């Protein structure tokens, strides 16, 4: 009897294990199905299953029984390779107690009957499992088909989006530091007063030679601009003078600072002269009062309007105005082209020159060199990029050069065909004062030249401060040598500097910024920037009041400084970094081209000066 009780306990424990195995098998099948289904659609992995999932309850059979129960479980798993789920569910607990010998035959019959039922159920389960696998395969196939359809839809949407990308880029607002805004900065730096003299070049040299020189100067401008931009990226320096100081020495820095400062001042005065002439002509044509069209009054108004723009530290805040400058130049080209046929019909002689060389060749070469001069702001514009990579910078500068070639070729050709050999050095002067379309172009050109002043000031400001600091330090050293034993030295040092403890110490480069040449030229020093802007504006206005025919003087010295800025110094930078180019033919061909333009630029400035003087 005791043995029967032990057997019953064992059977109960075994039945519990079997029931747990049944539950496990059900849960595991459901989990496997869900896992496969989810993996196909949502990509859920086993590592992402939560704590409450069936996967975490697989091995929890009967923890209350202890180690013996675990041993029984493992034995049953090893002995029974296959367990029929349905037979385990339908089979009742076996009663092994023999109450009488009569029940032996019944038990034997029950055993055979149960064995037969198990075979039938196994066949049914195999069919069900086969059908189940077929259904899962269908589900997988359907899911794959759905995924393929979804991918096709996404691909079609991406294709449509890429087709619309150029429209979105063309009409979306400019982002500061983007490729388009940087292209506009390059264009506004290069396209300026020199545009109005391009038709004069065509009249002096002919159409073919003028186009050849335009292409050559565009090639030179692209090479030198690319040299400056890539050198700025390589050394992480975005001021022209600082870049030359690192590659060469401090004398190169002083030279470029002087060249950039003088070029900006001369350009400022020239813009004031042209804007004053155009506005006075417009106001006089529309019968404004005489005091409004007065030269001094117009100059004061222009200076008061341009001062707040020069106080800005970053160029991104005036991007919209720079786009308007390009619009005004485009309008001028269209107006000249629209009237070219009419003015050409008025000419008595219609002799079109294709190729000719005369004494004005060097002067015309200088004009084209000025027109493509965007190198002065190349380092500054490179520093304005939000992602200054080589690909983005090259894309921006190449686009600007291409647009300049198109503008100059069209404007020069249309302007030359309008007046042929009677074309003046400023084509606007060929039109009568009552021409309304030209008056409108004059007004828009005034706006374009007006916004070129703050652009060039922001780029030239570090060079002006660096030049001022170097001159001040030289004066301090000179007085320190002359008056070392003089009692007036302390009072003089107090006048020059507030630092009485170390009055003759030179300023050094600021390690916290790379866009300033001295510690005084940091962007947060707004007071110093305002003082410099006011001083420069007053100086240029004073010169414009007293000298109205400064164009020849500016052409001589401006051409000389432009040759240094655009040809000689980029050539020096390329010569220092020439070892980085592996192709020797490309290396020496580029060096020869830069040397040619450097020599021609200097010779052109000298010859132009002699022609003007004599």
UniProtKB/Swiss-Prot annotation:
GO cellular component term, pick one: vacuolar membrane
GO molecular function, one term: L-histidine transmembrane transporter activity
Stored InterPro entries: AA_transpt_TM
Phenotypic consequence of gene deletion: Growth of the asexual-stage parasites and maturation of male gametocytes are delayed. Parasites are less virulent, their growth does not result in the development of cerebral malaria and causes less neuronal inflammation and cerebral complications. Asexual-stage parasites have swollen food vacuoles containing altered range of hemoglobin-derived peptides and less hemozoin crystals that are also thinner. Swollen vacuoles are also detectable in the male and female gametocytes. Parasites exhibit lower sensitivity to quinolines.
Keywords assigned: Amino-acid transport, Membrane, Transmembrane, Transmembrane helix, Transport, Vacuole
Signal peptide range in chain numbering: none
Cell compartments where the protein resides: Vacuole membrane
Transmembrane region(s): 184-216, 222-243, 255-275, 295-311, 318-340, 360-380, 401-417, 437-459, 531-547, 553-575, 587-613
Membrane disposition: Multi-pass membrane protein
Family membership: Belongs to the amino acid/polyamine transporter 2 family.
The protein's role, per its UniProt record: Putative amino acid transporter. Involved in maintaining the osmotic homeostasis of the digestive vacuole. Important for the timely development and growth of the asexual-stage parasites and male gametocyte maturation.
Further remark: Can transport antimalarial drugs.
Protein's recorded name: Putative amino acid transporter AAT1
Source organism of the structure: Plasmodium berghei (strain Anka)
């Amino acid at each position: 009897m005791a043995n029967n009780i032990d057997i019953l306990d064992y059977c109960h424990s075994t039945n519990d294990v079997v029931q747990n195995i049944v539950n496990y098998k059900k849960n595991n099948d459901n989990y496997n199905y869900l896992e496969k289904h989810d993996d196909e659609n949502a990509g859920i992995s086993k590592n992402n299953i939560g704590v409450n999932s069936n996967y975490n309850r697989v091995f929890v059979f009967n923890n209350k029984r202890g180690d013996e129960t675990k041993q029984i479980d493992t034995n049953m798993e090893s002995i029974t390779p296959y367990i029929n789920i349905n037979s385990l569910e339908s089979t009742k607990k076996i009663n092994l107690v023999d109450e009488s010998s009569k029940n032996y035959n019944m038990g034997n019959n029950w055993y055979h009957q149960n064995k037969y039922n198990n075979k039938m159920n196994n066949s049914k389960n195999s069919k069900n499992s086969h059908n189940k696998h077929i259904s899962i395969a269908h589900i997988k196939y359907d899911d794959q088909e759905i995924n393929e359809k979804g991918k096709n839809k996404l691909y079609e949407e991406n294709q449509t989006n890429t087709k619309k990308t150029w429209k979105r880029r063309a009409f979306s607002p400019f982002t500061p530091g983007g490729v388009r805004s940087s292209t506009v900065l390059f264009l506004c730096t290069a396209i300026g007063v020199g545009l109005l003299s391009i038709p004069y070049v065509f009249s002096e040299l002919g159409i073919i030679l003028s186009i050849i020189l335009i292409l050559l100067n565009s090639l030179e401008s692209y090479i030198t601009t690319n040299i400056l931009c890539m050198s700025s990226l390589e050394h992480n320096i975005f001021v022209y003078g600082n870049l030359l100081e690192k590659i060469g020495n401090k004398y190169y820095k002083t030279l470029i600072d002087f060249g950039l400062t003088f070029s900006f001042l001369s350009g400022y005065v020239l813009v004031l002269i042209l804007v004053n002439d155009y506005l006075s002509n417009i106001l006089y044509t529309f019968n404004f009062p005489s005091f409004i069209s007065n030269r001094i009054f117009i100059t004061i108004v222009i200076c008061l309007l341009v001062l707040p723009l020069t106080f800005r530290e970053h160029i991104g805040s005036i991007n919209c105005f720079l786009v308007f400058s390009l619009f005004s130049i485009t309008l001028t080209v269209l107006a000249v082209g629209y009237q070219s046929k009419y003015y050409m019909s008025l000419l008595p002689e219609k002799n079109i020159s294709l190729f000719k060389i005369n004494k004005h060749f060097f002067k015309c070469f200088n004009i084209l060199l000025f027109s493509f001069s965007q190198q002065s702001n190349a380092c500054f514009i490179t520093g304005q990029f939000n992602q200054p990579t080589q690909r983005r910078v090259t894309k921006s500068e190449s686009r600007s050069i291409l647009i300049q070639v198109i503008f100059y070729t069209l404007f020069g050709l249309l302007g030359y065909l309008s007046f042929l050999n009677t074309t003046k050095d400023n084509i606007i002067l060929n039109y009568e004062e009552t021409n309304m379309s030209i008056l409108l172009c004059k007004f828009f050109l005034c706006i374009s030249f007006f916004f070129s002043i703050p652009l060039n000031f922001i780029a030239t400001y570090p060079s002006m401060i660096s030049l001022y600091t170097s001159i001040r330090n030289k004066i301090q050293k000179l007085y320190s040598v002359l008056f070392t034993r003089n009692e007036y030295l302390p009072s003089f040092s107090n006048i020059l500097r507030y630092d009485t403890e170390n009055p003759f110490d030179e300023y050094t480069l600021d390690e916290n910024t790379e866009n300033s040449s001295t510690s005084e030229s940091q962007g947060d020093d707004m007071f110093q920037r305002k003082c410099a802007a006011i001083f420069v504006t007053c100086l240029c206005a004073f010169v414009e009041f007293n000298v109205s025919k400064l164009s020849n003087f500016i052409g001589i010295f401006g051409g000389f400084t432009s040759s240094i800025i655009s040809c000689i110094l980029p050539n020096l930078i390329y010569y220092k970094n020439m070892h980085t180019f592996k192709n020797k033919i490309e290396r020496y061909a580029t060096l020869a081209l830069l040397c040619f333009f450097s020599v021609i630029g200097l010779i052109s400035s000298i010859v132009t000066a002699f022609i003007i003087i004599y």
